[in-house]
């Protein structure tokens, strides 16, 4: 297309859930509540793991990292949407949009890699219990998390730079509540085939390889569990990875469901609604899944909350710590 028909983009319009103005207060309250529950729930998991030396193990080290990433993940999209609803202004700057895309991709990939590492951790714990502490030493745990960050940062940076190279036309409305990469690419006024090809190739590569690792880990885990003779032993072995399996299923099923629904349905509103499942709901329910299914986390949360309640004198910090543990504490009973 001729360069005269291109424009220097300064901002985009996030249409989000603006079709019905009467529902804006309800949507604002709902997303604010989910955001607060997510942040408080994941902070409570992190505080519980840090405060109890018994939880200073590889499994909980990875869980605390996952909770931190989930806080960052939901903070990438929801606060901007809440500000837009509050100010009745759906504008996001070009720089803000690219930045949002970068952090969105960064934390999605980190979630992906951390879930894979946690699957490997469960594989070693169940299939090689006698060598667990030797294999999953602190150096390896730190190295795996560091590599996950490096790969995720480079991938997000690469995808963002690909976005920067795209020329955009005058139609700059994004039918989403955040700068979803696929929606932004559709606004380009040039042939984006190469960009689409590269972006989808890297996404498929970075999604299928970790997923294959998870499948392999659980294949070996199931094989080991089936070889256990006692029913109690089978239940104990399975219970150690039940929470992780639930989170993995939720993360991949919701993410896959979004893109399948987008391909089958041309409704942008339906795509935006479906994406709420993996961008908001998944980070919100993760701490509750681990709290409900994990006796160690439940006991630490109860113990920490009780200590904060009886501690005196009351202060703002005291109130905040109690508030952080309250959601998971309620669901633990």
Swiss-Prot record:
Principal place of residence: membrane
Membrane topology recorded in Swiss-Prot or TrEMBL: Multi-pass membrane protein
Transmembrane segments: 26-50, 58-79, 101-120, 140-158, 197-219, 237-260, 273-292
Extracellular side: 1-25, 80-100, 159-196, 261-272
GO BP terms, alphabetized: signal transduction
Keyword Membrane attached: yes
Family: Belongs to the G-protein coupled receptor 1 family.
Name of the protein in question: Olfactory receptor 1078
Native species: Rattus norvegicus
């Amino acid at each position: 297309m001729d360069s005269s028909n291109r424009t220097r983009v300064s901002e985009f319009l996030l249409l989000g859930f603006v079709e019905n103005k009467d529902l804006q207060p309800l949507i604002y309250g709902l997303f604010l509540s989910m955001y607060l529950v997510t942040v408080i729930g994941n902070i409570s998991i992190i505080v519980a793991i840090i405060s109890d030396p018994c939880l200073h193990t590889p499994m909980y080290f990875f869980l605390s990292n996952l909770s931190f990433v989930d806080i960052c993940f939901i903070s990438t999209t929801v606060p901007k949407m809440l500000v837009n609803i509050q100010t009745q202004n759906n504008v996001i700057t070009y720089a803000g949009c690219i930045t949002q895309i970068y952090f969105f991709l960064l934390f999605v990939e980190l979630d992906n890699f951390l879930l894979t590492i946690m699957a490997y951790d469960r594989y070693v714990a169940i299939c090689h219990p006698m060598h667990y502490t030797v294999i999953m030493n602190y150096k390896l745990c730190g190295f795996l998390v560091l590599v996950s960050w490096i790969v995720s940062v480079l991938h997000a940076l690469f995808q963002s730079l690909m976005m920067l190279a795209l020329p955009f036309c005058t139609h700059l409305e994004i039918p989403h509540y955040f700068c979803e990469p696929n929606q932004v690419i559709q606004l380009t006024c040039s042939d984006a085939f190469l960009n689409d090809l590269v972006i989808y190739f890297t996404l498929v590569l970075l999604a299928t390889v970790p997923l294959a690792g998870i499948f392999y880990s659980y294949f070996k885990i199931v094989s080991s569990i089936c070889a256990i003779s006692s029913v109690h032993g089978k239940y104990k072995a399975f219970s150690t990875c039940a929470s992780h399996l639930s989170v993995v299923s939720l993360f991949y099923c919701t993410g896959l469901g979004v893109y399948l629904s987008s391909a089958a349905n041309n409704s942008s509103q339906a795509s935006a609604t479906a994406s709420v499942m993996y961008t908001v709901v998944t980070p919100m329910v993760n701490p509750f899944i681990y709290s409900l299914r994990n006796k160690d986390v439940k006991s630490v949360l109860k113990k920490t909350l009780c200590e904060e309640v009886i501690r005196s004198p009351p202060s703002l910090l005291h109130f905040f710590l109690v508030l952080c543990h309250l959601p998971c504490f309620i669901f633990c009973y």
